[in-house]
Design a protein with these regions (language model features):
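Local cysteine-cluster metal-coordination motifs and their immediate loop/turn environment
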Residues: 5-17, 39-49, 857-870, 888-905
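C-terminal accessory/binding modules appended to enzymatic or scaffolding proteins
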Residues: 584-606, 848-885
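N-terminal leader/propeptide and maturation segments of large enzyme subunits in energy/redox metabolism
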Residues: 71-77, 239-277, 354-355, 359-366, ...
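Extended redox/cofactor-interaction regions of prokaryotic respiratory oxidoreductases
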Residues: 118-189, 196-201, 226-230, 318-441, ...
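N-terminal export/assembly segments and adjacent metallocofactor-ligating motifs
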Residues: 1-239, 249, 257, 268, ...
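C-terminal catalytic lobe of FAD-dependent flavoproteins
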Residues: 747-842
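Immediate flanking context of iron-sulfur cluster ligation sites
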Residues: 1-6, 24-41, 847-858, 876-895
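Long, contiguous, secondary-structure-rich segments that constitute the structural scaffold
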Residues: 475-477, 481-538, 602, 606-622, ...
């Protein structure tokens, strides 16, 4: 069977994959044992990639042809590529000539390949003459990049994955790596197994799976990271655990920082952070006495109005103790997306230029103009992500071109985003998926190729450039992103710079990469020593890799010469500031958002597989059990979650992972899966609640903290439909069901199940009064329930349906007051099984299960479809090594390992 080596399209670990292809289709995927990022391992998401690339998925969710609508509110119609490209180029050129280039905004993505990114950036800044290009990496990595520049002089990650094998203290801050970077977390676990003396500290307001294996959990009050890091430095100074010779020889700005942290006494820090003094002192002791400290951090630091300060304050600790530039030591920013780093490398952000050049630097602008063959690169700063949508709402930006990202799900303050998209004169969406919330709002939809269909490169968290290779042709008329951009750019050239040499002479991704490579000469990320052939022959390579080098550099700054003008690292005396939105009597809870283990971003890809919902089947808001009790709520009660920007209705879930006064909602639950009109207005998923306050330096929004209130939702009438549907129609039917969300105060629809032939769907709704029968009939028709066995009681508001095929239960609908749906738990267990009793006996009020049942609970191990109840059954009889017994009998935890932290928590004490 033909095999193709490529790279996983999910997180920034950058795992190598081997794709198995047959008959023009991707039929399998496994980890590449030769790739240094993962050494053969894959997580649950990566190991199911081939299932997301099946034709039966593509035909339901992929954008397969260009589409255009001529008026808002009209349905888009398929058109040919030439018509689509001509239309886009004509509208952009006319807008530029009428309103100027800054009337255009391009919003791109860390999921694009480096070559895609490069041509987008060149089109914006070189051809159109606007710096209004930004990326969704602004939402995840810009604070990390800004802090690296402020302290080390350049956006250079000073560490590598090999450092995990060498560290003796792992310091996780704002990172649930067990979920967000699971393969990397497995490597940490393996390093600790080999070195039992190594310790782990986790700084996180929540008790996550990453915390479960930690030696010390600093469960700080959300947003107090800077105070914590200053407090640690205060203690390191007090105990003499800093290296004054290094500070004197290789850094600057220490006096100002020392004066600042003098005030951050243990008493003050423990009060601000809500932690114990002895834990603060112990953390400082472990750091100060460690041989090699590796800090690993992510969105918990970055997604904050103080994100740059949080990053810089952590880097201060490394500089003060010389925990940088040597094996096992350094501040390691874990990239959220597969090519967020590649976007920074090519300068595809509103404040950057090619090869880490600064837009504000006149010499850098002149260099790029010469390299590109244009008269000038514009000087005016571009609009960053949130600012771009604000400008569109004000009418300053007339055309938005959105590529490979879903801002109508992922951006904060969704009301702003929706108003911006409505105000723009033209919204162009270039995406592989037609099912995203943003695609639904597009005037022009350009179908793009996706994973397994593209050719190019990406750069992962450790600065390693990997090849992405094509294993099959894109479905329908979809095209590679760079080809779409180049085709539009060539049309624009004829209007905007007629008669001049083409800026876009490329015939392949390699052509683009070679030009990008040439722009890096003499820069901190110099890759002029690399060739396309070398990447093909020798595999992934790290930068910098200048001309004449025999290999890339694993650890920059080993010589303690930093990328500043003086060659010295800069301490950052950053003040502590509380979150942008304080809690108060009206909004007394601190809301955080974050990841689920088996989902990724808005779920346009992972959301196509029911099996990836097994671990977290439906949306909810997590609250501490005592918080629920204080509010007279029970698990499962529907609640209004309201911020100053919007509202959302969700079921409440009890979780001791959060503290009193705090709440958590997974970031993946957008309007594609959960909505309604609980407050008599449409809701737009979790980011209807989040705040668009920006970090003053990085312009990254504060997605990790919003003040909210929670009140019981008075929606006494409930409705649920669940059933098996043909896998070839599951996602198409889910999209059809989404159209009915607005009829309910609360509604959600998610897939479930592992069966590849018969997939599962569940639709759940709630309302103040019974929803119109015609709506229910339309929903039930999707499940084939129109001629099913029925039991109705109009007086009591009850409605039940059950459909069987060949004597097996296929679909069930239940409606009525909350108590009428109590049978759902055991009725769900009948799906796909022989009908045990006549349907009317199963549906009648007060019916009991025909046989004793134990609800399976959540799926803990997705690889082998192992549920909680089964694990507890086996553990009840386990002797000796309970984990080994579990793995031998159920296989859970023996494949990707993502479930291991949870399995260990379930073991008997």
């Amino acid at each position: 069977m033909p095999e193709v080596r490529s790279t996983c399209p999910y997180c920034g670990v950058g795992c190598g994959v081997i794709i198995e292809a047959r008959g023009g289709e991707i039929v399998g995927v496994r980890g590449d044992p030769q790739h240094p990022a993962n050494r053969g391992l894959l997580c649950t998401k990566g190991s199911t990639l081939h299932l997301t690339a099946r034709p039966l998925v593509a035909q339901q969710v992929r954008a397969l042809a260009p589409e255009l609508r001529t008026a808002r509110g009209a349905r888009r119609q398929p058109i040919d590529w030439d018509t689509a490209l001509d239309h886009v180029a004509e509208r952009i050129a006319t807008c530029v000539q009428k309103h100027g280039p800054d009337a255009i905004g391009l919003y791109v993505s860390g999921q694009l390949l480096t070559e895609d990114y490069y041509v987008f950036n060149k089109l914006a800044k070189g051809l159109l003459g606007t710096n209004n290009i930004d990326t969704n990496s602004r939402l995840c990595m810009s604070s990390a990049a800004t802090a690296y520049k402020q302290t080390l002089g350049a956006d250079i990650v000073p560490t590598c994955y090999e450092d995990i094998d060498c560290a003796d203290l792992f310091f996780f801050a704002g990172s649930n790596a067990a979920y967000a970077h699971p393969v990397l977390f497995r490597r940490v676990e393996e390093a600790r197994r080999r070195n039992p003396a190594a310790k782990t500290i986790v700084v996180d307001p929540r008790r996550t799976d990453t915390v479960s294996g930690a030696d010390l959990h600093l469960q700080i009050v959300p947003g107090t990271d800077v105070a914590l890091f200053h407090g640690l430095l205060h203690l390191l100074l007090w105990e003499g655990w800093v290296d004054r010779r290094f500070i004197e020889a290789h850094t600057e700005g220490f006096a100002e920082l020392k004066a600042l942290v003098r005030e951050f006494t243990p008493a003050l820090v423990t009060q601000l952070c809500g932690i114990r003094t002895e834990d603060l002192v112990l953390a400082a002791q472990w750091w100060g006495q460690a041989r090699a400290v590796l800090s690993l951090y992510c969105q918990g630091l970055n997604q904050s109005a103080s994100g740059t300060a949080k990053n810089a304050a952590l880097i201060n600790l490394h500089l003060a103790t010389v925990q940088i530039g040597r094996p096992g030591a350094g501040p390691f920013s874990l990239t959220g997306q597969p090519n967020a780093m590649g976007g920074r490398e090519v300068g595809a952000m509103a404040n950057l230029l090619s090869a880490h050049r600064d837009l504000a630097n006149a010499e850098h602008r002149a260099e790029v103009a010469r390299l590109w063959g244009v008269e000038r690169v514009p000087e005016a700063p571009g609009k960053t992500a949130v600012e771009m949508f604000e400008a569109a709402r004000r009418g300053e930006i007339k055309i938005l071109w959105i590529a490979c990202t879903n801002p109508a799900q992922s951006m904060p303050n969704q009301r702003l985003v929706r108003e911006a998209l409505a105000a723009a004169e033209l919204v162009i969406v270039q995406d592989a998926y037609r099912t995203t919330a943003t695609a639904a709002l597009a005037d022009v939809l350009l179908p793009a190729a996706s994973w397994g269909e593209k050719d190019g490169t990406v750069s992962n968290s450790e600065r390693r450039i990997s090849r992405v290779r094509r294993a099959m042709a894109p479905p329908g008329q979809a095209r590679e992103d760079w080809r779409i951009v180049v085709d539009i750019a060539r049309r624009l050239q004829r209007r905007l710079r007629p008669g001049r040499p083409s800026l876009f002479p490329y015939a392949s991704a390699e052509d683009i990469w070679l030009e990008h490579r040439d722009t890096t000469r003499g820069r901190d990320l110099d890759i002029t020593g690399l060739s396309w052939e070398m990447l093909e022959r020798d595999g992934p390579q790290q930068w910098p890799f200048p001309d004449g080098a025999s290999s890339g550099r694993s650890r920059p700054f080993e010589d303690h010469v930093f990328a500043t003008v003086s060659g010295k690292a800069r301490f950052a005396a950053v003040p502590y500031r509380p979150p942008a939105e304080p809690i108060d009597a009206r909004f007394p809870l601190r809301l955080a958002t974050g990841r689920l283990r088996d989902q990724w971003h808005g779920g346009s890809r992972t959301g196509t597989l029911g099996r990836l919902f097994g671990h977290a089947p439906e949306p909810c808001i997590e609250l501490h059990p005592a918080e629920l009790a204080r509010r007279q709520l029970r698990p499962g009660d529907l609640v209004h979650v309201t911020s100053r920007r919007g509202s959302l209705v969700l079921p409440a879930a009890a979780s001791d992972a959060v503290r009193m006064g705090e709440a958590f909602i997974a970031m993946h639950w957008g309007a594609e899966f959960v909505a309604g009109c609980g407050d008599e207005r449409p809701t737009f998923g979790v980011n209807a609640l989040t705040i668009d306050a920006l970090d003053p330096d990085s312009r990254q929004p504060e997605l990790k903290h919003a003040a909210v209130r929670v009140q019981k939702a008075e929606l006494p009438w409930r409705y649920v439909v669940f059933g098996q549907v043909p896998a070839s129609r599951q996602l198409e039917l889910q999209l059809a069901l989404r159209a009915h969300f607005g009829a309910f105060g609360y509604a959600c629809c998610v897939p479930f199940g592992h069966d590849d032939a018969r997939a599962g769907l569940v639709f759940r709704g709630a309302a103040a009064t019974p929803v119109q029968v015609c709506v229910l009939q339309a929903i039930e028709q999707v499940f084939g329930l129109e001629d099913a066995a029925a039991l109705d009681d109009a007086r009591r508001g009850l409605r039940s349906r059950l459909r069987a095929e060949g004597g097996h239960v296929v679909a069930i609908a239940l409606a009525g007051p909350v108590e009428a749906l109590a049978a759902e738990v055991w009725l769900r267990e009948l799906l796909g099984r022989p009908l045990p009793l006549p349907a009317h006996r199963l549906l009648r009020p007060g019916a009991q299960p025909p046989a004793p049942t134990v609800p399976p609970g959540r799926i803990v191990c997705n690889c082998f479809d192992v549920a909680e109840a089964e694990i507890r059954r086996v553990l009840a009889t386990a002797n000796g090594n309970a984990l080994a017994h579990l793995q031998a009998e159920l296989k859970c935890g023996t494949n990707c390992g993502a479930c291991l932290p949870e399995l260990r928590r379930m073991l008997p004490a």
